[in-house]
Amino acid sequence: MAELATIARPYAEALFRVAKAADLNGWSELVSEMAQVAAHPDVYALAHNPKISDDVISSAFISALKSPVGAEAKNFINMLVQNDRLTLLPEIATQFHALKNAQEGAADAEIVSAFELSAAQLTELVATLEKKFGRKLNPTVAVDSALIGGVRVVVGDEVLDTSVRAKLQQMQVALTA
């Protein structure tokens, strides 16, 4: 994986410079969508088929995107296809978002809850977490009933686990020690 990160870094940095000069949030959404499409197994098969020309691969990829694609994005996609790097887009997107977060003083927060959170609960939870972590958070929310109750939050390499499952595991360790 380190090798993929090394290869993807210059692409992410170049794309970030272009996005910063234009519409960073718009580019961020487009990069996320491109990464999602590039991660699809059919796109992988298409990109690695030697019988299909680069132009056809680029056109097919662009047509799979729902967002409008400007000239700069088309050039970026064409460059990735010509250099056989289209399937690197998920890693490029990860690094792009890390650069965006660093500039904004923000971080991605993965919030896993035992139950579905209402909009008000999520807003309150994010506000509390932003105070705790000292930066703006971009939350992604998932539900995992195995937590039994509470939430598990991952921000970068920090984990805050207030779930019932974690408490039970701590009690089990304490009792068996």
Curated annotation (Swiss-Prot):
UniProt name for this protein: ATP synthase subunit delta
Species, as recorded: Herminiimonas arsenicoxydans
Pfam family, one: OSCP
Record's subunit section: F-type ATPases have 2 components, F(1) - the catalytic core - and F(0) - the membrane proton channel. F(1) has five subunits: alpha(3), beta(3), gamma(1), delta(1), epsilon(1). F(0) has three main subunits: a(1), b(2) and c(10-14). The alpha and beta chains form an alternating ring which encloses part of the gamma chain. F(1) is attached to F(0) by a central stalk formed by the gamma and epsilon chains, while a peripheral stalk is formed by the delta and b chains.
Origin organism lineage: Bacteria, Pseudomonadati, Pseudomonadota, Betaproteobacteria, Burkholderiales
Function according to Swiss-Prot or TrEMBL: F(1)F(0) ATP synthase produces ATP from ADP in the presence of a proton or sodium gradient. F-type ATPases consist of two structural domains, F(1) containing the extramembraneous catalytic core and F(0) containing the membrane proton channel, linked together by a central stalk and a peripheral stalk. During catalysis, ATP synthesis in the catalytic domain of F(1) is coupled via a rotary mechanism of the central stalk subunits to proton translocation. This protein is part of the stalk that links CF(0) to CF(1). It either transmits conformational changes from CF(0) to CF(1) or is implicated in proton conduction.
Keyword Ion transport set for record: yes
GO MF: proton-transporting ATP synthase activity, rotational mechanism
Keyword Signal: no
Keywords: ATP synthesis, Cell inner membrane, Cell membrane, CF(1), Hydrogen ion transport, Ion transport, Membrane, Transport
One GO location term (cellular component): plasma membrane
Subcellular location, principal: membrane
